[in-house]
Amino acid sequence: MSLIEGLLQTSSTVTLLGTVLFLLVLYLRSSGSSSEGQGKEPPGPRPLPLLGNMLQLDLKKPYCTLCELSKKYGSIFTFHFGPKKVVVLAGYKTVKQALVNQAEDFGDRDITPVFYDFNQGHGILFANGDSWKEMRRFALTNLRDFGMGKKGSEEKILEEIPYLIEVFEKHEGKAFDTTQSVLYAVSNIISAIVYGSRFEYTDPLFTGMADRAKESIHLTGSASIQMYNMFPWLGPWINNLTRLKKNIADMKMEVTELVRGLKETLNPHMCRGFVDSFLVRKQTLEESGHMDSFYHDDNLVFSVGNLFSAGTDTTGTTLRWGLLLMTKYPHIQDQVQEEISGVIGSRQTLVEDRKNLPYTDAVIHETQRLANIAPMSIPHTTSRDVTFQGYFIKKDDSEWESPHTLTPSHFLDEKGGFVKRDAFMAFSAGRRVCLGEGLARMELFLFFTSLLQHFRFSPPPGVTEDDLDLTPSVEFTHNPSPHQLCAVSRV
């Protein structure tokens, strides 16, 4: 364990005082060059030197702290995460105004030190400027060509479902952790779109990539990495950062090897996936004399890494929340399975069935809303000086009738039909809206309905529904706390 991580885990008063003094020296050393911004800034709690407002923050549920502060300061206010000043937008209407109505102003990504270490300004998720615009445009066009969110995606998901069901069946109704099997199933969908083929769950290259991506997301949310984001000069003393950098190096090596194999068998007239399309575009530009385009190896490797990580953790985590919530609330599971049995019977569910399964669709949307796996999203930064709404705006009234419970009726009308809600922003909005939204919606619907069609989910022996803990695990995304479920065959 490193010095910094050891300090973070101790409760000794002497050590804590020593830590504060140690960090204060570093703060004084680094803060001399800071300058005040021009004009009146949004209100907020007064920050302490070095620590900012961190003593007011619930580290397990920081979004709860920020929501409470919005009641006092309004829907736009300032909060200091250590020495870093952040403007917080609270409430659906305010967020929509910024990300949609003023998309150009709020469309850049705030790239923290750890994410710069990950991507070096390349790829799709953690980049800005012309390179990001070109990579996102290329990704949107080509991922659609390979069926993301369309019939091609549906075929890939339907191909994967039997493999996941087989893994669940092997447990023969005994309690097990769904994390790994769900991770591999979802990872295979993006693998098929990016590389052109799926992997076996026993393939060490594939399992290594998937497990490493999951671990990296977990490490990114650790206290020591958040400390590094605030004080980058602490990097040499943070073990988690060393592990993350090794994971990124391994990812680059593995993606490079996979790309090399695809390059050797590349047919420009028959692209198998995203990588093939990128290689063809790169080759075409180079042959025409454009040697300094954005289509270079780093953008390819990091774009693939971004797609793989973003396309697996969020969807897989949401699906696991769905299974846990069905176990926690068996009466809702009953209604979902009754609807599936009445409409689908024993045949395979298809995307076109969604319109005839309004209750199931509502439960999936409500799972996304309640699980709220990225409650603070990924930080944005303004692309220029912005005047926004003025300050001390009255906080939005709650957009949800029962915000803290699983309530499918949030997405149902009085006749039981599915209804969209404007405040549902599970995929963000504006220029940075999730480019895989169509695919993720399709995966959640097909995987969820297929699993509920085949299995009855219940707590392990000796555990009641009330014992199941819905407190999320504190990571970069909100994962369910460690748990096991029983999947008993209904067929």
Swiss-Prot record:
SUPFAM superfamilies: Cytochrome P450 (SSF48264). Keywords: Endoplasmic reticulum, Heme, Iron, Membrane, Metal-binding, Microsome, Monooxygenase, Oxidoreductase. Its EC number is 1.14.14.1. InterPro entries: Cyt_P450 (IPR001128), Cyt_P450_CS (IPR017972), Cyt_P450_E_grp-I (IPR002401), Cyt_P450_sf (IPR036396), Cytochrome_P450_fam2 (IPR050182). Its cofactor is heme. GO terms for biological process: organic acid metabolic process; xenobiotic metabolic process. One of its GO terms (molecular function) is iron ion binding. This is Cytochrome P450 2K3. The gene is cyp2k3.
